[in-house]
Design a protein with these regions (language model features):
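Loop-centered beta-sheet repeat module
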Residues: 151-202
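N-terminal signal-anchor module of multipass membrane proteins
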Residues: 1-52
Length: 354
């Protein structure tokens, strides 16, 4: 269950960061009169509607796994911000529609920045609410006072020192991943040589600059964790296994630094090459995996310090259901891989400036 949770969350985070970063970058590029900038804006916008489907579909499995693993805590925190939590559905629907309008207006040569900006603000709101819930579930000491203040869940929690750095980390990570995404696009055969150079230059510089902010936010988020959590990540807990989560944090640091170096080489050197394109993809995925492993350790150790032991439970496994899930999951990945191969073999359409 844990491995499935970590795997699906990692994929979900990759899609989320692509959406958050790619959308605002598309908005900013659309404001320029540079033909290559407009080409980049349209290229990102056309892909964002697809990215949004992955954000939603890859977000459901980890939420269900989290409900099984942390049900009492997550259910309680969700009820305490119930008004905001249920509003996420409507906000996502509106964001999805705005993404299509943003793309359509760009393709028609109309001003679209304001549509994209509204969509980005709505996506950021959802990210904020999710961060709020994921941190509120770790704070049972405030649940009673919040319920007393509003039984219908009309208030958001305050006084959490970890919320701001965690949210900033996700937002900065969006631009970091968005820059790496541009590096990948610069290696696609569907763009002109001029567009490739522009994407490599801009994507590399954005990823390098925002990667530094991402690092700083990550160090800040780690620094505000309670002493018991830090000790647990160092292997000083009832479960030494969480030492691996602490080690994942150091691997995350190394991977982000490596990505910043690669991005700087490609961005400032205007390097367009297959190795930079695919290295960007590999580093982006590995960075998110390490982040998720570290994050999981922080969550479990925080709850453990408050007498919620995720491992202390009676497990009655329904192997038939587990087997069906694994078959469908692997089959779904196979179908996605086949669809990707079909797209890769299809005749390429140049995405030049309009």
């Amino acid at each position: 269950m844990k491995l499935l949770h970590l795997g699906t969350v990692s994929l979900h985070f990759v899609a989320v960061e692509m959406l958050v970063g790619g959308l605002l970058l598309a908005v900013l590029f659309s404001l320029s009169r540079n033909p290559q900038s407009n080409t980049t804006a349209r290229a990102l916008a056309r892909r964002l509607t697809v990215v949004m489907t992955y954000v939603i579909n890859l977000g459901v499995p980890p939420l269900l796994f989290a409900q099984v693993l942390y049900g009492r805590a997550l259910y309680t925190s969700s009820v305490l911000i119930g008004v905001y939590w249920i509003s996420i559905i409507g906000i996502l629907i509106l964001t999805y529609w705005l993404l299509y309008r943003f793309t359509a207006r760009l393709d028609a040569g109309k001003s679209a920045w304001w549509v994209g900006l509204i969509a980005w603000l709505l996506a950021g709101t959802v990210a904020r609410l999710l961060s709020t819930n994921m941190t509120l579930m770790l704070r049972p000491e405030v649940w009673r006072s919040m319920y007393s203040a509003s039984a219908m869940g009309a208030y958001l929690p305050t006084g959490d020192p970890t919320l701001e750095p965690r949210w900033l980390m996700m937002m900065a990570g969006g631009f970091f991943i968005g820059g790496l995404w541009l590096l990948y696009l610069s290696g696609r055969a569907t763009f002109t040589a001029e567009a490739k150079i522009y994407m490599a230059a801009m994507g590399g510089r954005i990823a390098a600059g925002c990667g530094i902010v991402y690092l700083a936010a990550g160090v800040w988020a780690a620094g505000v964790q309670p002493a018991s959590v830090k000790a647990g990540l160092a292997g000083q807990s009832a479960y030494p296994l969480y030492r691996l989560s602490g080690d994942a944090g150091y691997v995350w640091l190394a991977l982000v630094v490596a990505a910043v170096v690669v991005a700087a080489i490609a961005g400032f050197g205007k390097v367009v090459a297959a190795w930079t394109s695919w290295t960007a993809v590999l580093l982006a995925v590995l960075v998110e995996i390490m982040l998720v492993v570290y994050r999981d350790g922080v969550r479990d150790l925080t709850l453990l310090s408050k007498n919620y032991d995720v491992w202390d439970r009676v497990v009655v496994t329904n192997w038939g259901v587990v087997g069906l899930f694994l078959v469908l999951f692997v089959g779904g990945l196979g179908v996605i891989g086949w669809l990707v191969s079909v797209v890769a073999r299809a005749q390429k359409v140049m995405e030049g400036a309009a």
